[in-house]
């Protein structure tokens, strides 16, 4: 297994809304694995929004489903819900949908503001070469929405050493992982799995634990009992 640790400089922050979000779009404190994998795949599939996956169609990011990803905040930030002008016609009654008065509305949308802050993303995989992983890591341009621009400050490539047992981490992990010691900085969220890359299918929900303080928003270190984890440049990322 190899890993890529990517240090991303956020231009203003990022916004990734929660699954099944409707008219009120609350957001995540950290981008989920599917968002991180989509950002990595952009360097290879830029300009391709749809791909044939056999008998189905979906996002080209589906080809990267064997890549494991997680993230943490290197800087402090703030979560807020901005008022954003969005299309709301599909929430209206059928007789209202063609009325210009009901096409747009103001919607509270979750965002993490961290101007000039740093987001650290780790990818672990055995499905590509070090050279390709490094090239794609340097090609990341945004996280989340198209306006959530980032600049790659540094990329660290190396061998991911598989470990298990007790360890400390600041990266998020699935809630099936046992947390030991203090449990004061734990936020439970629902992400989704890779079937969400397939058009017309909904990704199954997966519960994760984010070791963060919510205000100011910052990643915190927690101790866990891991079955599958990897040492990546002096840190640990936990996947089960």
Curated annotation (Swiss-Prot):
A biological-process GO annotation: defense response to virus
Source domain of life: Archaea
Keywords, comma-separated and alphabetical: Antiviral defense
Family classification: Belongs to the CRISPR-associated protein Cas5 family. Subtype I-A/Apern subfamily.
Subunit text: Part of the aCascade ribonucleoprotein complex.
Job description of the protein: CRISPR (clustered regularly interspaced short palindromic repeat) is an adaptive immune system that provides protection against mobile genetic elements (viruses, transposable elements and conjugative plasmids). CRISPR clusters contain spacers, sequences complementary to antecedent mobile elements, and target invading nucleic acids. CRISPR clusters are transcribed and processed into CRISPR RNA (crRNA).
Record protein name field: CRISPR-associated protein Cas5 3
Organism, as annotated: Saccharolobus solfataricus (strain ATCC 35092 / DSM 1617 / JCM 11322 / P2) (Sulfolobus solfataricus)
Gene behind the chain: cas5c
């Amino acid at each position: 297994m190899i890993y890529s640790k990517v240090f991303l400089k956020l231009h203003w922050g990022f916004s990734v809304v929660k699954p099944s979000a409707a008219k009120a779009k609350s957001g995540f404190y950290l981008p989920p694995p599917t968002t991180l994998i989509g950002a990595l795949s952009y360097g290879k599939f830029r300009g391709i929004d749809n791909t044939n996956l056999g008998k189905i169609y979906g996002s080209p990011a589906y080809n990267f489903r064997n890549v494991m990803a997680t993230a943490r905040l290197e800087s402090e930030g703030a979560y807020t819900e901005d008022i954003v002008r969005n299309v709301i016609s599909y929430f209206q009654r059928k007789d209202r949908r063609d009325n210009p008065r009901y096409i747009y509305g103001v919607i509270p949308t979750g965002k993490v503001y961290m101007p000039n802050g740093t987001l650290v993303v780790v990818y672990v995989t055995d499905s590509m070469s070090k050279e390709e992983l490094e090239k794609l890591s340097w090609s990341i341009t945004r996280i989340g929405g198209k306006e959530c621009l980032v600049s790659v400050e540094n990329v660290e490539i190396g061998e991911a050493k598989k470990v298990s047992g007790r360890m400390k981490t600041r990266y998020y992990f699935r809630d099936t992982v046992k947390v030991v010691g203090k449990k004061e900085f734990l936020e439970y969220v629902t992400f989704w799995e890779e079937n969400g890359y397939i058009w017309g299918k909904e990704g199954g929900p997966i519960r994760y634990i984010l070791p963060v303080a919510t205000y100011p928003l910052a990643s915190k270190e927690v101790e866990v009992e891991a079955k599958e984890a990897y040492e990546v440049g002096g840190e640990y990322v936990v996947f089960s």
